[in-house]
């Protein structure tokens, strides 16, 4: 259940849309809530904050088993170490980091026709990046995370997130999250806004390099 992203500065064809006829934030929230309630009334189980599946779907089974994952395409049932992006602007995941193809369709075609990769840029992940990625993934998949457990799994025992907890406390006061030592749980009220809680652990947002 994806919301429409109006980015005319990036997608120039969107400039043809009369913005005065677009729903405002309150209307978008109401539409999302109605769609959410309708899908759940029909027997669909909510997966994360934007996916829905039948109760016997592999994605629901992965959710119950704590094995749900998330990639650039959304939620998934397989934690693949490598995800290859094929088309223009597609993002690929490698054990070492991420790569992205050139966005221009013509340039992409020329690279492929010449037998070359159409990769335009990439980024290598540090140990800190991998730790934060795991925390964000658990928050978005399980709506909960044990910071100590994730840190231990990444060989970073004793890692503390003081600044992140300050931000989370603001959300806790609004009833969106609950904090219990090193454990974080996103409440039912906060689930539609799970990305806000997860963003507390994204250091690249503050630098403009996300």
Each language-model region and where it sits:
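Short, amphipathic alpha-helical interaction segments positioned at domain boundaries
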Residues: 189-210
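Minor-groove-contacting beta-hairpin "wing" of winged helix-turn-helix DNA-binding domains
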Residues: 183-187
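Short amphipathic alpha-helical interaction segments
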Residues: 157-173
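A generic structural-conservation signal
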Residues: 48, 160, 180-181
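A short, conserved structural fragment
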Residues: 172-182
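C-terminal scaffold of the Radical SAM
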Residues: 1-156, 209
């Amino acid at each position: 259940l994806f919301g429409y992203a109006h980015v005319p500065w990036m997608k120039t064809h969107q400039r043809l849309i009369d913005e005065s006829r677009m729903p405002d934030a309150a209307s978008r929230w109401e539409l999302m809530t109605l769609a959410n309630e309708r899908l759940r009334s029909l027997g669909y189980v909510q997966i994360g904050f934007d996916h829905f599946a039948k109760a016997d779907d592999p994605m629901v089974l992965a959710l119950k088993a704590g094995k749900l994952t998330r990639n650039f395409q959304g939620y998934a049932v397989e934690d693949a170490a490598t995800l290859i992006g094929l088309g223009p602007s597609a993002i690929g995941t490698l054990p070492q980091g991420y790569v992205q193809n050139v966005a221009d369709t013509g340039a992409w075609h020329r690279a492929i026709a010449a037998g070359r990769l159409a990769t335009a840029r990439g980024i290598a992940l540090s140990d800190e990046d991998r730790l934060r990625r795991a925390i964000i993934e658990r928050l978005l998949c399980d709506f909960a995370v044990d910071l100590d457990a994730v840190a231990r799994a990444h060989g970073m025992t004793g890692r503390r997130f003081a600044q992140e907890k300050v931000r989370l406390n603001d959300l806790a006061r609004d009833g969106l999250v609950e904090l219990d030592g090193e454990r974080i749980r996103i409440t039912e009220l906060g689930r539609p806004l799970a990305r806000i809680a997860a963003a507390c652990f994204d250091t690249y947002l503050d630098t403009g390099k996300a």
